[in-house]
């Protein structure tokens, strides 16, 4: 019997440069991975098998699935691509004016949504033929460069540089439903919507995560809070690490955070508790994704150049089996009432 290390099984054939994102399919244990080595790769995470690879004209900054064997990728070469691993075929949906940082596919709207450093969000209809004039639905100006996107149902959350957060309804993109400022004082690294659709978690470069709610009523806003994480004390000094990644568990609504300290923590946001911390990974955590049933967690251990160019551990993808005890909220224990 092969003993699986505590940090999970390492996949063979990893990218040769920084990993920008990884995502599990909604239908299987297929894993889509984008990288600065200009590649998008499709793995079978269970069988440790690379099923296919596309090479693009620049660093690939994000990717997402459409169905089990096709998806979308966005690139520093400004292009938005549709990629089909079964057919071995790619085509360009369109372009931005600057590198494209993030991509999401909305199953609710049947649209691809991209965010770029050109300070725009664009929506595309992937069913159209190739060519911008046939596939582009709309362009929406943002206050700053787009750093992170997240979708839940018809809601789109856009986090930009300058700590801006815009919240849209995909059915009416003419203007944001809400314009907000991040509750955190420093640059946003990642935004992810709660699976139940009530709000979003947002992480910053300064070792913090904030828990936010869409409902603007006083009662709902009273529930929002922020907490410190991915820090350590050394010689009386607090060393603070960027929190690069957030991933919600699809069943329990708890979430994982990954930081430049090489740690992955599991949190129960409702009860404001850390449930688990995994053993340290070789380098920074660049991205995280739970499988569709929450039974696997994919971890990109990949230096994110937060300390500039320096020797670092090789970029690697680990797939870890998730034990229910690590992710299931613990029931609140109430003291027995006096007799």
From Swiss-Prot:
Its main location: nucleus. WD repeats lie at residues 14-53, 95-134, 141-178, 238-277, 280-323. InterPro entries: G-protein_beta_WD-40_rep, WD40/YVTN_repeat-like_dom_sf, WD40_repeat_dom_sf, WD40_rpt. One of its GO terms (cellular component) is kinetochore. Disruption phenotype: No visible phenotype. This is Mitotic checkpoint protein BUB3.2. Has a dual function in spindle-assembly checkpoint signaling and in promoting the establishment of correct kinetochore-microtubule (K-MT) attachments. Promotes the formation of stable end-on bipolar attachments. Necessary for kinetochore localization of BUB1. The BUB1/BUB3 complex plays a role in the inhibition of anaphase-promoting complex or cyclosome (APC/C) when spindle-assembly checkpoint is activated and inhibits the ubiquitin ligase activity of APC/C by phosphorylating its activator CDC20. It holds the Pfam family WD40. The gene is BUB3.2. It comes from the Eukaryota. One of its GO terms (biological process) is chromosome segregation.
């Amino acid at each position: 019997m092969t003993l699986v290390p505590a940090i999970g099984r390492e996949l063979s054939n990893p990218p040769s440069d920084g990993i920008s994102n990884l995502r599990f399919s909604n239908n299987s244990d297929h894993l889509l991975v984008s990288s600065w080595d200009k590649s998008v790769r499709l793995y079978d995470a269970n069988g440790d098998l690379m099923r296919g690879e596309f090479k693009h004209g620049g660093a690939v900054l994000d990717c997402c699935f459409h169905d089990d064997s096709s998806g979308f990728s966005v690139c520093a070469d400004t292009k938005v691509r549709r990629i089909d691993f079964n057919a071995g075929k790619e085509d360009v949906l369109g372009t931005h004016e600057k590198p494209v940082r993030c991509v999401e596919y909305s199953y609710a709207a049947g649209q691809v949504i991209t965010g770029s450093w050109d300070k725009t969000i664009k929506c595309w209809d992937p069913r159209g033929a190739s060519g911008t004039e046939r596939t582009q639905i709309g362009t929406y100006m943002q206050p700053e460069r787009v750093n992170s996107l997240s979708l839940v149902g018809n809601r789109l959350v856009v986090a930009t540089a300058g700590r801006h957060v815009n919240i849209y309804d995909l059915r009416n993109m003419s203007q944001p439903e809400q314009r907000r400022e991040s509750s955190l004082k420093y640059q946003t690294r990642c935004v992810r919507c709660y699976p139940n659709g009530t709000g979003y978690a947002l992480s910053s470069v300064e070792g913090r995560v904030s828990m936010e709610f869409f409902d603007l009523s006083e009662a709902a806003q009273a529930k929002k809070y922020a907490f410190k994480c991915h820090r350590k004390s050394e010689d009386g000094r607090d060393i603070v690490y960027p929190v690069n990644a957030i991933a919600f568990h699809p069943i329990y609504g708890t979430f994982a955070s990954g930081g430049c300290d090489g740690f992955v923590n599991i949190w129960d946001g409702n009860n404001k508790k850390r449930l688990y911390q995994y053993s340290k990974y070789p380098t920074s955590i660049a991205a995280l994704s739970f499988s569709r049933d929450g039974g696997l967690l994919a971890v990109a251990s990949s230096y994110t150049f937060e300390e500039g160019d320096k020797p670092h551990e090789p970029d690697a993808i680990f797939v870890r089996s998730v034990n229910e005890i690590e992710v299931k909220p613990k029931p609140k224990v109430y003291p027995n009432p006096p007799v």
